[in-house]
Structures are given as C-alpha cells and as structure tokens.
C-alpha cells in the first residue's frame, strides 16, 4: 500500500498571493481519486504530496517565454516535497527541431533557475496532457512532479528515492563494443573532462514500438501528438542531465514522426521477448526511412521486456551504427523517473561514448571506477549484486564525462555553438601523504566569472582490479575504488569517510538506502596505497534554446592521496568519553601521534578545535597551531553544551581525527552587577556600604 502524505497548512501565507501563482493549491479532496495508470508502476514512490493544478493559468505563464513572445524569462512557482511553493526563473528549452516545434506548438519544454533555492535547477515539459518536472537539488535527492489523477488535474510531488530490485531490468551493452579510439584517448593525459565554453547540439531520431504508442492512447498517426508529448517528457529530463554534465542538448528531428508505429502486427520490430533483434531492426529502419545523413543518434523506446542495449558504444555520428540503441521497461510503464533517468540516460550514455562504471564485473575498459554496483548513471545500482544503493544518483561519473567529452570532440556531427556562459576556473589541489586508518578531508575551490551557483563533486578515479565480493570498499584493498560517489554539493569539502561515520567512531560506511546488507561503500585504508581523486565543478547554468543561448559548463582538477603504513592511525585519545568539564577551565587534550611527524607524512604541527553541536561544525579554534607531540593544554570557552567534540587536525595536511563521544561543558556562573548599593554611617574617614548579594557569586 502506498503511503499518501497530505500536507495541510493552517494558514495559506506560503502561497504568495500574486495572481500568477494561483495555479497551484494543495489537494484537500476526500473522495477516491481515479489515478493515472503510470501510478501503478512498481517504482512509483510510497511517499508523496498532492497538489491540484490549473493548467490554463500555468500555461499562460509558461508561454510568455515561448519564442521570446513577451520576454526571454518569466517567474513561475512550483510545489516542493516540503509542501511549499518555490520560485523559478524559466526560459524556453525546446527539445524539438524548428520544423517539429512549428508543427506541434502546444508541446513545449522549459528550463528554470531557482530563486527560492539558488542551487536548484528545473526541467519542465508541457503538453495539453499536463506537465512533468525534474528539479535538480544540491547535495540531496532530486524532486519530480508527475500527474497523479487520470484527468491530470492532481499532481504528485516526490523525491527520487526508488525501491530496490522491483524492476528486473538489464543493460546488455557489452564493454567490448567500445570504439577503440575512445579507449585509447581516455587513457591519455590529454583527456577532456570539461566543457569548452560552448554548447553541442545533436539530432535525435527517436522511434517507438506500437506498444509504446498504444500505452499513451495512440492507435493511429492522427494521435501522434500523444506520442510526441510522452517522448518530450522523457527527453526533457534526459536533456537535463546531458546539459548539466556534458554541455550537450539533443533535438528530436521532425522525421521521427515517420518512425512512430501504432500497429504491433505491422511495425518493423520483433515482440519484446525477442528484443535482441531490435538493434539491427532499428538501424535498418532509420537508414531506410530517415536516411543516415539526416540524424546523428538514433534510439528506440519499447513498452515491455525490461532491457536496454546501445548497439555499440560511442558510435554517434557513425553511419550504419549510430541508430541502434533501445530502451524498454520491465513493468510495462515506459515513463517516469526510473525509465527516464536510470534507463534512457544510461543507454544513450553508451551511445555517446560511456562504458559501465561498476566494478562487481570488470569489463576491461579502464573505467570500472565505482564501488560494487556503482551508483552513478552508468552503474547498476539496485539491479545487480553488491548493490551499494537501491537506485542511481542523477549524475554521470567523472570518468564517464571524460569518455563522452573525448568521444564527442573526435566527432564532426555535433553542432558547436559558442555561448556567453564561461567555464568555471578550478584551482589546483596539492597532493598529500597521510597515515593509515585516519580520516581526511579534501577541499577544493573555484571561481565563476558569471557568478553562477557552483557545486562540487569529489570522486575517486582508480580503475578496479578486483570483482564480485572484492569489488566493495575494504580497508585492505590495495587498488581500485574504495570511495562511493555522492551528489554534487555546495560545499567544496568532502570528508572521508562520511562525517556520520567518523562521528560514530568507524572507519567504514555501509550501504546507502536500499543497498545490499553488508556492502561497504567507504573504507579508510589500513595498508599502503595510492588514491587518485578528481574534483568536478558544475556551474549549473540552465539550457536556453532561445537567444541568448546558454548551457551549463564543467571543469575539473586532479590530485593524489598517498596512504603510508609507516604511520598511523592518528587518533584523539582524550577526551574520548562523556566527561563533564567546566567552562573556562584548563584541560589537557591528548592524541596518538603514531609516527606522523616523520617522513613521508612530516606533520610538525596540529590545530585543535571545538564543536558544540556533536561534531557537525567546529567554529571554535582552541589553538591554531601547536607541536604535534600528542598533548596540549587548552582553555575551554564558557559555553554550556552536552554535545561537545574535539578535533585535532594536521596543519599543512588533510588528515584529522574527532573524539569518539560527546562530552559536556558546564558554564561557570558569571558575576552580575550588584544592586541596592547604599551608604550608611558616613564619617570623614569611613562609611558603611551595603548591597544586594548576587546569587552564585
């Protein structure tokens, strides 16, 4: 049973009273809702909020930016999973080529930049059938809006958290199908893992099986708009990833309407049980119906079967191979966030030049750089063994970005447009040597001439040499991935392992939500080894198809952490229990130096800081630099707390430790100003003074 969370507000002030925002209201109905059939899919979330939309009013605001009719931008409001409305500044972001867009002016796509949350970006698709959205968040789950009621008047708002193993889907694209030139180029030092200050646009030929068309109610060519609206919904979300990570946008060509089919007995594709034939059947169809000169990448959507295959990897622009990829769901619902992001973006990612990044199997491509199943788009999160999570996160791994950018730069078919948005400048990060079994933090920095809202993503960049049970993170792992990828955040700092793990006094992190029990996703090394890391910075600029054209840009920097077993673990030894210390008192902090003053770590001094919120932040610097000799007397601030922690960190290095337990600081009473001062028995030589005593003085 799905758990419906209805959000009722006691006061309506969250809903700004401007007329343009009256198209949303919280659903307060008590009757049974006849739901849209997509709600029945296994991957539909268990927790969501419901809102009623006035599509005519919303359309009026959206269409103000169509073809620059009234303005290049406009501000709209959308509900979020907290039950509030937030504002976005939108621009047109058409997924159709000019000919197709002119034929179907009621089917549109938009991008939006967050105003309420400046780090949020929006992708929104519109048609007479309703809207769908995807909101990219920083450091937390993305959010979606999809129709909930059959008449598309009630919408569900939910986060991108999906349940594990409910969709038995498999990508059968073999790693061996990688074009040799890509494999060679991506291993060279001159890799391209950044945007070049431009936008790349490619022509997409999208075919669909009759079963796909029928699912959306189209049984003849007179209903092609229903199919195009569905394709537009999916492509809007997919382009959101391509634009943000690759500075790439796919445009659906008008000739795609010639390869949309409605009758299963006469379409050119086998039934789903024989979908292995679809690669060849699609390629033959596109070659004969559309012509190789008229598209850059071709793909097929099915409705059932639970599979995907790109045909080959990196073969965009290559005649006779570029149109052989397909995606089809296992639950009979070719729509929704699972289908759009986990499957379609994955398969087209192969066609663009990306291999699988998981490491539970080593495909020999040099890019199996994720722990276990992997968690980024080109991984297999939630559908294989050694699952680190129940579902993927909505980004490409840094090595995928490098593969695809390298491949696209070698192709002539993408149209390259110079844009006004500049690429972020990422500052170089030094290499470090650290002791074994000791937490560390990597800190980056970047600037952006346009003032864009930058996000940061630290990822390990080591190819796996072990598989199966040895593919997960381990303290004794000598090579390969030991650190899970996470969503980009607004902070340039990443703690290794996660701060929650460090505060629990642990050196390893278990699986994310929905991952397999026992799978380790992060591990501090207890052996000597080398760890390569890449920091990818995204500027999160939104794509605009109308002048001035714009798209997001990325930049990166690499660094190396060397772990040595000649020192460590470096640990705080006192306080390490729930002691109670008085404010303003002098206390002795101790730590295990563990050989860290000697080469190659060579840490001469440490910094000691205090947290009063359980170790989440350390704003109080007790001593900025003191010899790394294992003991230092400090004076505590007179701040009452029951959640104090001590942090001892290397000066000029990246390693540190935090005390294992919260401790208490009791504030000493301070003397107040006395009151009631009076003089009595005054003589030439003396006087008696009296006043009211101050409690605790």
What do these predicted ranges mean?
Residues 438-442, 585-589, 685-689:
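Structural beta-strand segments of beta-rich domains
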Residues 253-277, 317-394, 459, 463-474:
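The catalytic-center signature of Zn2+-dependent metalloproteases
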Residues 669-696:
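Pro/Thr/Ser/Gly-rich low-complexity, intrinsically disordered linker/stalk tracts
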Residues 251, 457-527, 600, 607-609, ...:
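Exoplasmic/lumenal beta-rich domain surfaces
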């Amino acid at each position: 049973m799905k758990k419906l969370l209805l959000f009722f507000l006691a006061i309506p002030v969250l809903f700004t009273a401007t007329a343009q925002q009256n198209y949303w209201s919280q659903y307060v109905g008590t009757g049974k809702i006849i739901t849209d059939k997509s709600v029945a899919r296994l991957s539909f979330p268990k927790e969501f909020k419901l809102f009623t939309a006035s599509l005519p009013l919303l359309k009026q605001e959206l269409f103000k930016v169509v073809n620059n009719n009234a303005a290049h931008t406009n501000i709209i409001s959308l509900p979020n999973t907290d039950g509030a409305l937030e504002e976005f500044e939108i621009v047109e972001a058409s997924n159709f080529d000019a000919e197709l867009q002119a034929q179907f002016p009621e089917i549109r796509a938009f991008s939006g930049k967050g105003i309420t949350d400046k780090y949020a970006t929006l992708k929104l698709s519109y048609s007479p059938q309703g809207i769908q959205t995807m909101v990219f968040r920083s450091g937390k789950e993305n959010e979606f809006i999809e129709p909930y009621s059959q008449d598309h008047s009630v919408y569900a708002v939910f986060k991108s958290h999906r349940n594990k193993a409910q969709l038995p889907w498999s990508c059968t694209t073999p790693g061996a199908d990688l074009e040799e030139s890509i494999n060679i180029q991506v291993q060279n030092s001159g890799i391209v893992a950044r945007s070049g200050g431009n936008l790349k646009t490619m022509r997409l030929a999208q075919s669909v099986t009759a079963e796909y068309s029928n699912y959306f109610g189209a049984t003849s060519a007179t209903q092609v708009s229903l199919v195009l609206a569905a394709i537009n919904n999916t492509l809007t979300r997919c382009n959101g990833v391509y634009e943000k990570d690759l500075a790439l946008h796919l445009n659906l060509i008008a000739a795609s309407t010639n390869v949309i089919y409605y009758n299963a007995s006469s379409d050119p594709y086998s039934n789903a049980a024989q979908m292995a034939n679809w690669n060849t059947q699609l390629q033959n169809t596109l070659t004969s119906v559309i012509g190789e000169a008229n598209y850059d990448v071709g793909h097929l959507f099915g409705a059932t079967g639970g599979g995907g295959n790109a045909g080959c990897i990196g073969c965009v622009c290559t005649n006779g191979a570029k149109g052989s990829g397909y995606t089809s769901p296992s639950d009979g619902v070719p729509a929704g966030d699972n289908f759009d992001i986990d499957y379609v973006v994955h398969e087209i990612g192969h066609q663009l030049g990306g291999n699988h990044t998981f490491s539970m199997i080593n495909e020999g491509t040099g890019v199996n750089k994720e722990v276990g199943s992997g968690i980024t788009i080109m991984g297999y999160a939630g559908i294989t063994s050694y699952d680190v999570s129940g579902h993927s996160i909505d980004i490409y791994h840094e090595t995928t970005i490098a593969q695809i950018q390298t491949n696209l730069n070698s192709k002539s078919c993408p149209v390259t447009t110079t844009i006004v948005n500049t690429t972020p400048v990422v500052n170089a990060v030094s290499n470090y040597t650290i002791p074994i079994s000791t937490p560390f933090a990597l800190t980056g920095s970047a600037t952006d001439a346009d003032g864009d809202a930058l996000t940061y993503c630290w990822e390990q960049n080591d190819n796996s040499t072990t598989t199966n049970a040895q593919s997960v993170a381990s303290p004794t792992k000598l090579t390969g991935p030991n650190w899970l990828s996470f969503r980009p955040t607004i902070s340039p700092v990443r703690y290794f392992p996660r701060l929650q793990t460090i505060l629990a006094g642990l050196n390893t992190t278990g699986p994310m939500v929905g991952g397999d029990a026992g799978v380790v996703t992060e591990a501090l090394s207890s052996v000597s080894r080398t760890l390569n890391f890449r920091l990818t910075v995204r500027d999160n600029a939104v794509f605009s198809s109308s002048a001035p054209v714009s798209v997001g840009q990325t930049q990166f920097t690499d660094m190396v952490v060397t772990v040595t077993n000649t020192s460590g673990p470096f640990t705080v030894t006192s306080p390490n229990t729930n002691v109670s210390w008085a404010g303003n008192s002098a206390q002795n902090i101790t730590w295990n130096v563990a050989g860290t003053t000697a080469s190659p770590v060579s840490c001469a001094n440490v910094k000691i800081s205090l947290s009063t919120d359980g170790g989440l932040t350390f704003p109080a610097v007790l001593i900025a630099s003191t010899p790394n000799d294992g003991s230092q007397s400090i004076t505590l601030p007179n701040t009452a707390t029951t959640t104090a922690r001590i942090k001892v960190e290397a000066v000029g290095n990246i390693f540190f430790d935090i005390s294992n337990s919260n401790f208490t600081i009791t504030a000493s009473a301070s003397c107040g100003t006395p009151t009631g001062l009076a003089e009595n028995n005054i003589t030439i030589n003396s006087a008696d003074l009296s006043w009211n005593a101050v409690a605790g003085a």
